[in-house]
Amino acid sequence: MSTVNLDIVTPNGSVYEKDDVELVVFQTTAGEMGVMSGHIPTVAALKTGHVKVNFRNGTEYIAVSGGFVEIRQHKVSVIVQTAETASEIDVERAKLARQRAQSHLEDQDNSDINRAKRALARAENRLRVAELK
């Protein structure tokens, strides 16, 4: 089976690269999308979610927050604000972040509800991906 090269990049540089990927699945703003070798060139906006990476020896999950994906025939580039593999996620830190975000959402005087909603979505996403180890 043909494979693609996957590169996940954050503002800090490349954080994940794999050459033998059979299938990459991610959540775009239009819905879930899967990519295999030979896919037509595409650019899509990503929402906070996970990237599922299938390769011959297994599957890995990477939590990502906002960005976009560029798909070429044999290369997928994911450009996001943050990215963590399931094994890199500090579950306790993610739980604390979720609690803080929930607290801010409950505070009716909080003027930055949208920021708290985004923080909550990121924390919950990290916890979901951490469970996929």
UniProtKB/Swiss-Prot annotation:
Keywords: ATP synthesis, Cell membrane, CF(1), Hydrogen ion transport, Ion transport, Membrane, Transport. HAMAP family: ATP_synth_epsil_bac (MF_00530). SUPFAM superfamilies: Epsilon subunit of F1F0-ATP synthase C-terminal domain (SSF46604), Epsilon subunit of F1F0-ATP synthase N-terminal domain (SSF51344). The keyword Cell membrane applies. This is ATP synthase epsilon chain. It comes from Staphylococcus haemolyticus (strain JCSC1435). Produces ATP from ADP in the presence of a proton gradient across the membrane. PANTHER family: ATP SYNTHASE DELTA/EPSILON CHAIN (PTHR13822), ATP SYNTHASE EPSILON CHAIN, CHLOROPLASTIC (PTHR13822:SF10). One of its GO terms (molecular function) is proton-transporting ATP synthase activity, rotational mechanism. One of its GO terms (cellular component) is plasma membrane. Belongs to the ATPase epsilon chain family. Its main location: membrane. F-type ATPases have 2 components, CF(1) - the catalytic core - and CF(0) - the membrane proton channel. CF(1) has five subunits: alpha(3), beta(3), gamma(1), delta(1), epsilon(1). CF(0) has three main subunits: a, b and c. It is a peripheral membrane protein. It holds the Pfam family ATP-synt_DE_N. InterPro entries: ATP_F1_dsu/esu_C_sf, ATP_synth_F1_dsu/esu, ATP_synth_F1_dsu/esu_N, ATP_synth_F1_esu_C, ATPsynth_dsu/esu_N. It is found in: Cell membrane.
